[in-house]
Amino acid sequence: MLDIQLLRKDLDGVAKRLADRGYPLDVAAFSALEAERRAIQTRTEELQARRNSLSKQIGAMKGRGEDTSAVMAEVGGIGDEMKASAVKLDEIQARLSELMLEMPNVPHESVPVGRDETENVEVRRWGAPRQFDFDVKDHVDVGTPLGLDFETGAKLSGARFTVLRGPIARLHRALAQFMLDTHTQQHGYSETYTPYIVNPDVLYGTGQLPKFAEDMFRVEKGGAENTVTQYLISTSEISLTNTVRDSIIEASALPIKLTAHSPCFRSEAGSYGRDTRGMIRQHQFDKVEMVQIVAPEASYAALDEMVGHAEAILQKLELPYRVVALCTGDMGFSAAKTFDLEVWLPAQNTYREISSCSNTESFQARRMQARFRNAQGKPELVHTLNGSGLAVGRTLVAVLENYQNADGSVTVPVALRPYMGGVERIDAPSSAA
């Protein structure tokens, strides 16, 4: 959530910056609510002052033995008006809160202005795409003989679900373990296991609600009546970041660096017809997430660090990739600045997103009331960052395509072999040695 004081001080400036990311701020609605709020608060202050004056007058009159009934009646009327004003003020504050919850974060000044992904800016590339001397297959054709089973996934759960078997399942598990070990042993993150089902207020905290309810899977407790609807997490960013909600952290405890491996559940409501083949866009997929909770002055250095941590995974796997700075029109709702990592997929002859690393500044912290005690001993909002480290399914796709061989086998990246019992390549069961 944005700082309402920022809007009060520079409403037109905020509106312009939000317009850069495609959000039309309703300046008239905000201004009208603010004017009404100020009028009620001013009137309430006047009434309070009048009531205080009358209370003193009543005391003096009683001391002189005078009749105070008329003055007391006026005080009673003032009390009634103040109660009505308080109710009206609560209504206005609620409407302001609703308006604020719909507003995305303000882009950082360094974010390139653009309408959509076509105007993102490439920052750098790493690695050269492999030159194949045979016809390249996509991950579906490579993986199906090795245990990638879309037919059974569809039979069990419908479209955009997959069953992994045998060597493919083992490779998928190896990737997740390798990512976790790298982040915990080399990058300083603390491995964390959190619930996959969360309450609505948790999703308000990280910005998925109220705007993106249609992208979530809702769950209800069987056999229970009048229960609160809960949600399956779309990323473990949600649960990891909310571990610091409603808390004041000592400055000495910062930065807090957390990582988790979890399934992620997304309805993909706005993705009809996109990436319908294979594992690129699934309703359920695994991801290793990185989250950092930091002091405000450290957040952009932390963003660069986090991007480097995601890059390290791709470099160890020797997968070519590029880093892209997202433009204003392509950033996520809560982000002030985002870098995407895109991995090379030879069958598509292009780079595809495999990680997104974002600094939300104080946007999520304000919603969560996550604070730290600053040098002056006063509570101050932390900055929160999140990044994929990496999406496990898409990394599996990249390994299958980049490490495929002409005979249908797949070479196991050197970094993964300790997690595969020393296996150097995987073959279809029918042709395995």
Curated annotation (Swiss-Prot):
Transmembrane segments: none
Protein's job: Catalyzes the attachment of serine to tRNA(Ser). Is also able to aminoacylate tRNA(Sec) with serine, to form the misacylated tRNA L-seryl-tRNA(Sec), which will be further converted into selenocysteinyl-tRNA(Sec).
Keywords: Aminoacyl-tRNA synthetase, ATP-binding, Cytoplasm, Ligase, Nucleotide-binding, Protein biosynthesis
Gene: serS
Assembly with partners or alone: Homodimer. The tRNA molecule binds across the dimer.
PANTHER family xref list: SERINE--TRNA LIGASE, SERYL-TRNA SYNTHETASE
GO terms of biological process kind: selenocysteine biosynthetic process; seryl-tRNA aminoacylation
Protein name listed in UniProt: Serine--tRNA ligase
Top-level class of the enzyme under EC nomenclature: ligase
GO molecular function, one term: ATP binding
Pfam families associated with the record: Seryl_tRNA_N, tRNA-synt_2b
Pathway field: Aminoacyl-tRNA biosynthesis; selenocysteinyl-tRNA(Sec) biosynthesis; L-seryl-tRNA(Sec) from L-serine and tRNA(Sec): step 1/1
HAMAP family in the cross-refs: Ser_tRNA_synth_type1
Subcellular location: Cytoplasm
Annotated residues for binding of ATP: R266, S267, E268, E353, I354, S355, S356
